[in-house]
Amino acid sequence: MAGLAATVIGLYGRLQESEKSSSAEKEQTFFLVILYVFLKSGKTMLQSLREAASRRRYIKHLSEVSSFLVRESERRTLADGLKQYVHPSREFTLLLGSLGEDLESGFGVVEKVEKLIEQAISRESDRWKRYVDSVETLGEVVVSVILLIPLIYVVGGLLGGFPLIYSVVIAIAAAAVLYVVSSASEPLHLVDLPRSITFISTAVIFVFGGVLATSLLGFMPVLLGVVAGVATLVWGLFVHFMYVRRAVAEGEASFLLLDGVAARLRAGYPLGRSLEAVADPRYKRYAMAIAHGLEINPYNRFMALAMETVKIARLGGLGAEALSLLARLALSIYLSFTGARARMKLYTALAIASGAAIIAVSAITLAPFTGLPQDVATEVQRLIAVPSIEPVLPLAMLVSYVLGVVVGRIEDQTIAACWRAGAGVLATLLVYSIASAFV
């Protein structure tokens, strides 16, 4: 028992370290941008770390690391604290160590951070490409496993019965693995919807997921499917058009804002008046908000950081060169993110069609048995138990629902993007209504 407890504790510790490492690598780009903005505005490294510690919206984990480094600077020099800090992410440990060495030697820390951002620009597309490749590989395995479920059900039924709950567990476990792995390996988290929307969406997903789970008991599966599908689809489309699309578009707007401000600074125009003169609708609202001191809450984290950067530039703390560098980073991130989303469109189609495919494969597999003459069918039923297609419907709806939620989270970076789940359930019901007429 003691050995098992030690193993569990050790495994939990490893999982925590892995989570910290993943979070650091995911937030590292934002961390570098925050340091760069405040270092270029004239603050010291210690002051810049204090600013980073207060930016939990962008760097939830690394803000805690920044706070720790600030506290450590009270016991020893900041350079020693940076050099001796050990993080589960080897890459982040080396980054802090190199900054500590430059700080100790008196070499340009600002130039080092600038160089690191240049490297981030060049590698951003590669990071997203590797991420999509890994998700696609795992996604193919998951889809293959899920599409085998109807065959397992039918063959198991012919051999004496295969409990449907096993199929449910297999499907949900496969989708859960895809969700966890994709979330952990995400290169950069950009979409940041209001907490209220995320909370309501989570409630919608669990409530109507529970409704579909109830249909496994054989209680009005068609009616429950229609209710869950329509409700999830309507709410998901509302979130998509009101929030997700804006969050994606703000990625381009962040580049336009930073690049436009940099161009005006190079031309010698007063920044405040230039912001008021912006006419491009893609980023006009953000420029006007900065110019008039209005509060606006972007749904894209880089857009929020870009607005904060322009506010600092308006106070005279940043030049055109710094803003141009950040504009190039914003463009690289936007193109990489939208490129990844475009490659994921196939999985949106697969998620929506997964339940329908399960129904179709089940119907095709059962067709040879249900199309027999009456006397032959009676004899076959006496020899083997031919399964029915009706019990497959709740399973197929639940699979399409879960996959729709997972794919929405991967493609749009938020669990609130649940319209695919509702569309999948309705597509499953449509195919079932057709298939049930033949088997």
PLM features per residue range, with description:
Residues 157-166, 190-193, 213-224:
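Membrane-helix interface and helix-disruption motif detector
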